[in-house]
Design a protein with these regions (language model features):
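Flexible coil/loop and intrinsically disordered linker positions at secondary-structure junctions
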Residues: 5-169
């Protein structure tokens, strides 16, 4: 009985395939597209890093970053402000991922920026790796952060000096 039923189902399936004419046009036509909503323009300042850094603190950090040579180029306060707003007109190139991770980790520990800073940098493609010219990923930044927790990177004392100055206000 089961065999007959199985044969019956197979015949139905074969009949349904044979009875449906293939129309080339029907395959190419996309299904009804839903109207894409216009992107909503949000006014105000974007703050993905949840930065609470003041203009004076940004200037101090610029000195720190330039003295420690965290990036391959010298930066100015406008660049760092744009970095924290994820509105860079280009990208920064890391000179030392471990130093960058150490700085960002310290800023996060003292609640100057969000704990999720790695995702913000990766998702917004803000920094290129020094050697491979590819954007730093969350994984790259996570590895660098884990590494600096065990072995301080060369130049960490420069960052610590400026972090202490930040805390003094």
């Amino acid at each position: 009985m089961q065999t007959q039923y199985l044969e019956y189902l197979q015949q139905l399936e074969n009949a349904s395939h044979a009875s449906v004419p293939l129309d080339e046009k029907s395959e190419e036509q996309p299904k009804e597209e839903k109207a894409q909503p216009e992107p909503t323009k949000i006014v105000g300042k974007s703050n993905p890093f949840k930065s609470v850094l003041t203009t004076q603190q940004i200037k101090l950090l610029v000195e720190c970053i330039n003295e420690a040579h965290i990036f391959t180029t010298t930066i100015i306060p406008k660049i760092l402000s744009d970095f924290f707003a994820c509105k860079l007109n280009g990208v920064l190139k890391s000179n030392n991922n471990r130093l960058l991770a150490y700085l960002m980790m310290q800023l996060s520990c003292y609640n100057y920026i969000a704990y999720e800073w790695q995702s913000v940098i990766a998702n917004n493609k803000l920094v290129l790796a020094k050697i491979k010219d590819k954007y730093l990923t969350r994984s790259d930044l996570s590895s660098a952060t884990d590494n600096v927790k065990c072995i301080y990177p060369k130049g960490y004392e420069i960052i610590d000096k400026y972090i202490k100055q930040l805390q003094k206000g």
